[in-house]
């Protein structure tokens, strides 16, 4: 729970409650060294809710040290409540059989039953209430072949039945690994993958801490993608490897939020179907040089979605072909650890990536309607945003460096470790969001950053 505000800042009450629980039972049967049967039954329950209230003119009582905000249901100007419940019951069984040193076989089945409840209340009015019980029944077969020592084949498929879609879903896959020399592996693979749920997180949300999920609309094709991957891995020495991989993904079916759903039929109009394409290249270097170890990575990616957002049957290239929210063309990561001696060790983490995409504000408009009306003297006190291309702009590059020091100790007879860390060592201003003030003329925009330089410490011990 958080409550902030006072003086010229709106009063805000923010309550955030979440939790999950998992129960699992499994049984393994091994009749001989070549034969293994595994059976599992699990139940997972996940609940997340947010209660948000804002008062643009809070009653403040000032003191020398703080402002006390009087904010309650009667005085709040804006309220929002969200509740998301997910229950997942999963029963599955797999059978693995090693026929010989050159052939192994694996098969199995799965029954997954879900219960999904999602509800939104805005300004004390329920705007979204979706309840569903999707079920997926599937079976799979996978064969690994090693006809000669330098070549491996992996071939298989998964056959699924989704209770909200009439047709059976077939997902084939195949892969090959070739070792021309003992220290080099060349790899290629293809696979078709289906997903029966899609995320419904709002594009404008500030922090995507968790994903909210809903099943594919009734009688609609599940999300489907074909993955093509080619790569190589080279073992320089013990603990030192280099890998390079390139990929192309073609999505024949995806779902994105409908900007104008029909709230009388929210279940079937909450999302719009479309297509997408993604490609990229990834480089990874793992190092282990006595006292210095860690890894360095670089990735380039491009992800574009195509969705008929206005549902007119025509794709508008400028506004309906757009980057995904998580599209970051360039990403560099480094994680290094240096062992000074048996007691002390240093750590360094560096991240550089392209900024996250966002939908830009390109103008403002007077809000209409009784709720947005100001007063007789000043009727146009409320403004709304005019948005540009979805995810058409990008925040500045994200740069962050963290350092840490670990000290091993034996306190109270416990093997433990003291950990000290400085987050965002360079105090780089990484933009979290832009907030527009349309009451000014011309409108003004204020950038808000993520966390500044932060010092943390902790004590980790083993019992």
Annotate each PLM feature.
Residues 343, 352-381, 396-402, 406-463:
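C-terminal beta-signal and adjacent terminal beta-strands/loops
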């Amino acid at each position: 729970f958080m409550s902030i505000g006072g003086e010229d800042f709106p009063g805000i009450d923010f309550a955030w409650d979440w939790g999950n629980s998992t129960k699992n039972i499994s049984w393994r049967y091994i009749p001989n060294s070549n034969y293994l049967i595994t059976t599992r039954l699990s139940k997972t329950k996940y609940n997340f809710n947010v209660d948000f209230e804002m008062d643009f003119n809070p009653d403040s009582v000032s003191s020398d040290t703080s402002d006390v905000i009087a904010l309650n249901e009667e005085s709040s100007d804006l309220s929002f409540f969200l509740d998301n419940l997910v229950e997942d019951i999963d029963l599955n069984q797999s059978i693995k059989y090693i026929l010989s040193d050159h052939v192994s076989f694996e098969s199995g089945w799965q029954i997954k039953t879900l219960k999904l409840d999602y509800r939104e209340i805005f300004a004390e009015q329920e705007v979204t209430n979706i309840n569903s019980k999707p079920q997926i029944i599937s079976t799979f077969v996978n064969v690994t072949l090693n006809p000669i020592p330098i070549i491996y084949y992996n071939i298989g498929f998964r056959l699924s039945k989704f209770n909200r879609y009439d047709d059976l879903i077939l997902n084939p896959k195949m892969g090959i690994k070739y070792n021309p020399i003992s220290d080099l592996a060349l790899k290629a693979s293809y696979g078709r993958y289906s997903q029966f749920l899609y995320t419904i997180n709002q594009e404008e949300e500030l922090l995507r801490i968790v994903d909210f999920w809903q099943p594919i609309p009734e009688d609609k094709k599940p999300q489907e993608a074909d993955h093509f991957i080619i790569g190589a891995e080279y073992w320089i020495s013990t603990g030192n490897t280099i890998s390079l991989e390139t990929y192309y993904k073609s999505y024949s079916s995806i779902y994105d939020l409908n900007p104008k759903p029909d709230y009388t039929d929210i279940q079937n109009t909450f999302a719009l179907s479309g297509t997408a394409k993604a490609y990229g290249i990834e480089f990874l270097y793992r190092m282990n040089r006595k006292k210095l170890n860690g890894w360095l990575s670089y990735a380039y990616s491009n992800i574009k979605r195509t969705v008929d957002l206005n549902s007119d049957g025509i794709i508008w290239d400028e506004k309906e072909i757009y980057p995904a929210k998580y599209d970051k063309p360039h990403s560099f990561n480094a994680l290094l650890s240096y062992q000074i001696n048996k007691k002390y060790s240093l750590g360094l983490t560096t991240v550089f990536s392209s900024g996250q995409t966002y939908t830009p504000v390109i103008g403002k408009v007077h809000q209409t309607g009784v709720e947005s009306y100001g007063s007789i003297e000043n009727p146009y006190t409320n403004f709304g945003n005019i948005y540009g291309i979805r995810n058409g702009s990008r925040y500045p590059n994200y740069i962050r460096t963290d350092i840490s020091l670990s000290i091993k100790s034996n306190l109270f007879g416990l093997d433990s470790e003291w950990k000290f860390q400085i987050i965002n060592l360079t105090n780089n201003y990484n933009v979290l969001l832009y907030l527009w003030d349309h009451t000014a003329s011309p409108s003004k925009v204020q950038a808000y950053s993520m966390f500044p330089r932060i010092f943390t410490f902790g004590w980790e011990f083993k019992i």
